[in-house]
Structures are given as C-alpha cells and as structure tokens.
C-alpha cells in the first residue's frame, strides 16, 4: 500500500470518507444530489445551446454567460459523479495523481468562474455607463481576449494551488474527510510544517478572490453613480434590474468561496465545511441558469422559441 514518490507522499492512494458520518441518510442525499446534478448540467448545457442557436443572443453579455455556464458545467462534472458513487458504494479510493488532477481542474474552473464574473461585471459597466459606445468597446476581439485571459488565469492559479499542496508529504493518514480533493481537506492530511504551504494557498486565494471581487466592486461603484443620475425612478429600476441577477450570483459565489479558502487550517470543521462545499459545488452552478438566465426576458423568449421549434419539429 505504501510507496515513496520523490518524498511527496507515503501512500499509493487516498480514500474519500465523504458523507459516511450521515449513516442512513446517505441514500436520501444520493437522490437529492443526483436530482440537483442532473438539473444543473441539463440547464447549463441548454443555456449554452440556446445562446448558440438564437442570433438575438449573440452579444457580449450572453457570450460571457455561455462561457460561465460551460465553466460551471465542467466544474460540476469533475466533482459530483464521484461524490454520487461514494454515496452508493461507500469510501472511494483515488490515486495520488488522480487526486492532484482533480484538484487542478476543480481549482482551475473555480478560479475561472471568479474571473468570468468580474468580466461580466465589466460588461455591465460599459453597457450602463457608456451605452452609446458599447458596441465599439465590447468588440469581438476584446471579448475573445477577456474570455481567453479568464480561462488562462484560472488554469495558472489552479496549477499553482495544486503544486503548493502536492509538494508536501502525506504520511499520517490517507483518509480525506471530504467528497473530493479540495485544498483544505487535503492540506489537513499533510505531515510536517505546512505553514509555508498554508501561506501560499492563502496568497493565491486572495489574489483570485480579492482581485476579481475588487474589479466587480469598482464596476458597480461606477454603475451605481450612473444609475443615481437617471432622473426617473422607472429608469433607475430598469437599470438596476439588469445587474440584480449578476449581483446575486456574485454574493453567493464569493461568500462561499471566501469561507472555504480564506481560513487557517486549524479552523476546518468536517460537517460545517461539507455543507459549505456542497452549497458551492452543487447549488452555486445551479444559480447560473436559474437566477441569472431564466429571469432574463431575452433568454425566456429564446427558450420559448426553442420549445416551440422542437414541438413543431415533432409535429
């Protein structure tokens, strides 16, 4: 069972304990999470398809939304299936390299989501504060650069977090008190002095969360000033309504992420952290199509047209 791998670990694999402490409730959790998983993936994929097929939605706002749906879908696909398998079959083993790979992709997609949300905030800033110049400023070349930078930055930060964690030794235990290879529970298994790695994870997390959140805050500060200058109450309400869904997703996304990653290792709690992780992993990706998209009239119209076209095709 043991092996030496460049002094990085003493174990061949890790074992997820997942929700083993919930006992007989695991079957109920499996049904609940399976339902949420199917709804999340289906709704996000459907949003991507609708935006792709409807020419009225070929704008920067919906381009960014479709990439956010894509990123959320990839994040969900990388975590939830193994979690569901663990609920049915009990403790699931994962190799050292498999754990590192899962951490890299989950961290990369999570970071990418943060950067995409900041890009979407910038898009709302241009749309409200400079509407006459929106088309020229948010041109296809700039949109492609913003999306590409978001994904590249996400991958780089994900790689950095993974390298910081897996340079450590894991000799004391190989049981992960979690349902996937997230940085806090894996870091808690490391033996020896982990203060430098904790500091590295904290710095990387702060760079992702604070920088992207700062950009969103600056964008909305300008948006708020522009909205307050609108003379009519109805005009202010309409302007704010275009940002309300994005703000809802931002608050929940950054609230959960900050609680999960901006704390010292000593403050980790199994039950509490699993609840927050489930909210971040399962519920947050579901908010994208429900809160941000399905409340949007243009998306609602596109969905109706898609269903109408599907029914006519069957007829």
Predicted regions and their residues:
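Transmembrane helical core of 7TM receptor-like proteins
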Residues: 1-315
């Amino acid at each position: 069972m043991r092996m030496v791998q460049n002094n990085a670990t003493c174990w061949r694999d890790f074992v997820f304990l997942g929700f083993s402490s919930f006992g007989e409730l695991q079957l109920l959790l499996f049904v609940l999470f399976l339902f949420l998983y199917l709804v999340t993936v289906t709704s996000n994929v459907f949003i991507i398809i609708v935006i792709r097929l409807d020419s009225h939605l070929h704008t920067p706002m919906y381009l960014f939304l479709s990439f956010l749906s894509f990123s959320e879908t990839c994040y969900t696909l990388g975590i939830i299936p193994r979690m569901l398998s663990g609920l049915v079959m009990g403790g699931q083993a994962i190799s050292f390299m498999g754990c590192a790979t899962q951490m890299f992709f989950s961290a990369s997609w999570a970071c990418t989501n943060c950067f995409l949300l900041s890009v979407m905030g910038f898009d709302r800033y241009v749309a409200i504060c400079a509407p006459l110049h929106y088309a020229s400023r948010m041109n296809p070349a700039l949109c492609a650069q913003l999306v590409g930078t978001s994904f590249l930055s996400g991958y780089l930060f994900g790689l950095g977090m993974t390298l910081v964690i897996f340079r450590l030794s894991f000799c004391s235990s190989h049981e992960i008190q979690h349902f996937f290879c997230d940085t806090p529970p894996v870091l808690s298994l490391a033996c020896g002095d982990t203060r430098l790695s904790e500091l590295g994870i904290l710095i990387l997390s702060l760079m992702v969360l604070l920088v992207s959140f700062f950009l969103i805050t600056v964008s909305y500060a300008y948006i708020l000033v522009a909205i307050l200058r609108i003379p009519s109450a109805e005009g202010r309400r309409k302007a704010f309504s275009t940002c309300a869904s994005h703000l809802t997703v931002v608050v929940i996304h950054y609230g959960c992420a900050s609680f999960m990653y901006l704390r010292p290792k000593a403050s980790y709690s199994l039950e509490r952290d699993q609840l927050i992780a489930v909210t971040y992993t399962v519920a947050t990706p579901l908010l994208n199509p429900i809160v941000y998209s399905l409340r949007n009239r243009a998306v609602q119209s596109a969905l109706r047209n898609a269903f109408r076209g599907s029914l006519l095709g069957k007829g």
